[in-house]
A protein has these predicted regions:
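Intracellular juxtamembrane helix-capping segments at the cytosolic ends
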Residues: 79-93, 289-304
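Helix-to-loop junctions at the C-terminal end of transmembrane segments
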Residues: 23-36, 123, 238-250, 332
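Hydrophobic core of transmembrane alpha-helices in multi-pass small-molecule transporters
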Residues: 63-80, 276-290
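Extracytoplasmic gate region of multi-pass secondary transporters
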Residues: 115, 180-229
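Helix-loop-helix hairpin linking two adjacent transmembrane segments in secondary transporters
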Residues: 94-95, 99-161
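Central cavity-lining transmembrane alpha-helices of secondary-active solute carriers
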Residues: 11-29, 229-241, 320
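C-terminal ends and interior cores of transmembrane alpha-helices
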Residues: 45-60, 260-273
Length: 366
């Protein structure tokens, strides 16, 4: 429908991550008022509205309207993340927060793995198709997705769920830490930096993977795209496996191990090149698997009534997915494709620090 330059095409990613930067903290304050369940319902409805707006965007062939619809859709996803992630951790059994959230995130990874080929089959049409056919191929899937999200919102509204705000308030009364601001929790701030580094590193590696597979491993574009699925699919496998591993290993210890291995794989890729670099970088997807849910649960642990605000702050750090890839790309232009991966290696080094020391709750809070 649109004939876009590379810069215009990149506005899609920019709009998506900008929603996290701008809307996460307001979403946290909203959840504080309407509750976690209300936030989940609202997230589904806002996302559905964004999907509906793709209909007029396609009809008018207006890219600005398309970007506006995408921003609204992303805002709904932000609210879902801000409300849903802490909701899961607050309702989980004590000590099982990371494992429970990892299991939930595993289904997210499952959707991420199967959605691209499914979406491509539904949306992409023959190159010789008429404009009307191309417009319809975009409109109908998004209307269907909007209907599905509305159905989910109604389902959540009908299910009787506990008020997690009461659990959070009880946690605050039990701790008696005397803190008057969410920013006084050092482990929360360090956790937000951890999310910034994790999402940035993950997206940077994934975004440049096809270039590595083509220029370093010598694959053609089609094969490179197929191999890329292994990177994202590894996250799905790792999350399902991580759920059970966390029954035996402490969450922070598993996080430290995974981040250390990911960093080591990057170093191996840089010094080796060729197929060794290819398989090393693809394997990182497996070790990325448990990082987001584990960093999130450790960063929001013991915050009580401040949990919703903390969730907003931590989710705003997802903007790292827009900034760190740009930095790594700039280094790739100057020092080379593989050497530029040192940027992602630094991200994983920070995550190791957070997993070993930064996650610890202040003694007054414990």
């Amino acid at each position: 429908i649109f004939n876009l330059s590379y810069t215009q095409a990149m506005l899609v990613q920019f709009c998506f991550f900008t929603a996290y930067a701008l809307m996460s903290i307001p979403a946290g304050k909203l959840v504080e008022k309407i509750g976690y369940k209300g936030g989940v319902i609202g997230g589904f409805l806002i996302a559905a509205f964004g999907c509906i707006l793709f209909y007029p965007a396609a009809s008018s062939a207006s890219y600005p309207i398309f970007l506006g619809a995408l921003f609204i859709l992303a805002t709904g996803i932000v609210l879902l993340q801000v409300a849903g992630n802490p909701y899961v951790t607050l309702l989980a059994k004590p000590g099982k927060e990371s494992a429970t959230l990892t299991l939930i995130q595993a289904f997210n990874s499952l959707a991420t793995t199967i959605a691209p080929p499914l979406g491509a089959a539904m949306i992409f049409v023959d190159a010789n198709a008429s404009l009307a056919e191309r417009i319809s191929s975009v409109q109908m899937p998004y209307l269907g997705l909007a209907g599905f999200m509305i159905l989910l919102a109604v389902t959540v509204a009908m299910i009787k769920l506990p008020d997690a705000r009461q659990i959070a308030q009880a946690e605050t009364e039990h701790n008696h830490d005397g803190k008057t601001s969410v920013w006084q929790y050092k482990h929360m701030v360090l956790g937000a930096v951890g999310i910034f580094c994790y999402v940035g590193g993950e997206v940077a590696i994934g975004s440049m993977m096809v270039n590595v597979l083509e220029k370093v491993a010598g694959l053609d574009h089609e094969k490179a795209a197929n191999y890329l699925a292994l990177y994202w699919g590894g996250a799905m496998v790792g999350r399902f496996a991580g759920t059970f591993i966390m029954d035996k290993v402490k969450a922070n210890q598993l996080l430290a191990f995974n981040a250390s291995v990911a960093g080591a794989l990057i170093v191996l890729a840089i010094v080796s090149g060729g197929k060794v670099a290819m398989w090393s970088l693809l394997a990182i997807g497996l070790f990325n698997s448990i990082m987001f849910p584990t960093i999130f649960s450790l960063g929001t642990h013991g915050l009580g009534k401040y949990t919703s605000q903390a969730s907003g702050i931590i989710c705003s750090a997802i903007v790292g997915g827009a900034l760190i890839p740009v930095a790594q790309g700039a280094f790739a232009d100057t020092i080379g494709l593989l050497p530029a991966y040192f940027v992602s290696a630094i991200c994983y080094a920070y995550i190791v620090f957070f997993a070993l020391k930064g996650y610890k709750v202040d003694e007054k809070t414990a």
